[in-house]
A protein has these predicted regions:
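Pepsin/retropepsin-fold aspartyl endopeptidases
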Residues: 1-147
Length: 147
């Protein structure tokens, strides 16, 4: 309740993230996050449980490497042990700090870029939505917070 009141008084609405523009242009739910003036596009993927960052952009994004490792299953069904890092991103003044699995997504993201024109830097999976209590509404084309 306090969060909603603060956001209303400050003029900030960080409780919803629109993916309408990306859906209209590319038919993919993509949200752009920021680190200062740098933009990073993330695919909202409820089919993935984990968040993934493309290892090829780690030199462009502030992150803290962690000792955490996890198994990552690719689309081909193969399991790989990958490292993780913590990344803090912002959206409309809200801060989102989360652990991302580091994976080489170059081929997949290049394919998406060639077919849709959108440059992706990572994937937000269902654990992110659960942590931040977000629900995807494809009628309104927003991700909104239940809190």
């Amino acid at each position: 309740m306090f969060k909603k009141l603060f956001n209303k008084l400050s003029g900030k609405n960080i409780e919803s993230m629109s993916f309408m523009e990306s859906m209209n242009l590319t038919e993919l739910p993509v949200v752009t996050f920021y680190q200062e003036d740098k933009k990073f596009n993330f695919l909202l993927d409820t089919g993935s449980s984990d968040c993934i960052i493309d290892k090829n952009i780690l030199d462009q994004i502030e992150h803290e490497e962690s000792d955490l490792q996890s198994n990552l299953f690719g689309l081909e069904g193969k399991r790989r042990l990958v490292k993780a890092c913590r990344i803090c991103l912002s959206y409309k003044g809200g801060q989102y700090e989360y652990d991302y699995l580091i994976s080489d997504m170059k081929d997949a993201f290049t394919n998406i870029k060639q077919t849709t024109g959108v440059t992706l830097h990572g994937i937000l999976g269902s654990k992110f939505f659960n942590t931040y209590k977000y629900v995807l509404d494809f009628d309104k084309m927003i991700a909104y917070s239940k809190v």
